[in-house]
Amino acid sequence: MRAPFSRTLIDLICEQSERYPQQPAVIDERGSWTYPQLRDRCLELASALRAAGIGRGDQVGLLVNNRAEWIEICVAVSALGAVAAPFSTWSTPRELDFLLRDSAARILITLDRLGERDYAAEFSSLFADTDRRPPALEQLVVVGESCPVGGKAYETWLASAPAFELPPPGERARPDDTAFILYTSGSTAHPKAVPNIHGAVIENGFHIGERQGLSPVDRVMLPVPLFWSYGAANAMCATFSHGSTLVLQGRFEPGPALDLIERHRCTSIYTLPAITHALISHPDFAPARTRSLRTAMTIGTPQDVATVAQVLGAREVCNVYGQTESYGNCCVTWHHWPLERRMAVQGPPLPGVRLRVIDPESGRELQAGEVGAIEVSGYLTPGYIGASATQNAEAFTADRYFRTGDLGSLTPEGDLIFKARTSEMIKRAGINVAPADIEDVLRQHPSVAAAGVTSAPDPLKGEIIVAYIVPARDTQATPESLRSHCRALAAAYKTPDRF
């Protein structure tokens, strides 16, 4: 289909509002919003942000799960030339402190609570303590029913905003401005800050949607977090650039996910091997419940791809390869290819992407069939920022290729075949985990003198986390105490599976 003309998120939503005035843009577990309704909400929020002093180049912290507010916040900031900085809702207070300081967010928009986490109480305490509060952070806005002293209730805040008209192009975001900063786990103890640029993320997202065969009739199910590039840079931009509908699940649970797919007749799903397994293993799963699925996006082994097509029922599933630095995906198979080909390769580079495989020792570019280090250029982050900016020289070549840390080869047809990871990263159930991060947490346990973390293959999760420790003198560390310690200081998915 024809690509949209717009190259910023706010302009894209405004354009699609004119093209598809009756089309739902977002559905979450509470309701549905058409493209014009989403546009109006974004402009209302932009007015509130401007009244709060937010302008060009300012960072807006975002701690919200998959719901319509996440989308409208991410889009609205671009009306002012500001930048969204989404944070993982799995982050511990210690990790959030780093994210707030590194992003220099001037305002934080957060959920009141999610599961057992009471974010409102956590941030109320933080704002009351000027010694602990990050220096750039000035304001707190809370999404939900409870709002602490010192914070502003999101809906009340929006309702009190003055009337707002979209600023002229020179005042709002430009195509070469940063749309959002995504934090991704890396080989260092802290996550890396990865800017994604408006024009590039929309263009790359459009090409991803083309590989899936998306159109305005499609409804795209998203059970994975929007704060991942797989969600924000990939699913959101692929969906909105095609006038399709994004169906959000606030927190993945297989039973409710099956309900959403069936109720809204979703035609595409962004999945991972662990999610696929959870869906098809659920006692309420039946092929009839997912018969609306046509296509999907997944990573994994050839069998993982086949399972999505043949068991889950998304017969035109796309096999993919990419990372946050390349806007979610840089290679995607075509949905209409024979399944055997989609199982065997991760597809050709997307338009505008250049990919090469080199000998990691000599730097020589390799021929088809030769296995070497994968490097990517084209639609690519301009570089890490914040504390991780020191990693740029190591991560990017002089001619602006990104060193992915992966091994692979190219077929004579130009398709990428991913072989293995060369970096130290552990990919547990599709989530990147840095060993250094876990080692740092383990070393803070009073019974640990030294710690090392590695991975082991696992048929369900791909890799699991294995930790080795040297006990401190005259102490005894039990696996139970170590797990409790890790869960207290780091997100739950970083807790080692085996000691």
Where are these regions (language model features)?
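Conserved pre-ATP/AMP-binding loop-to-beta segment of ANL
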Residues: 22, 141-142, 152, 159-183, ...
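Conserved AMP-binding A3 loop
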Residues: 34-36, 172, 179-203
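A short helix-loop-beta submotif of the ANL/AMP-binding
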Residues: 58-59, 65-85, 89-93, 98, ...
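Gly/Ser/Thr-rich phosphate-binding loop
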Residues: 158-159, 263-271, 280-343, 354
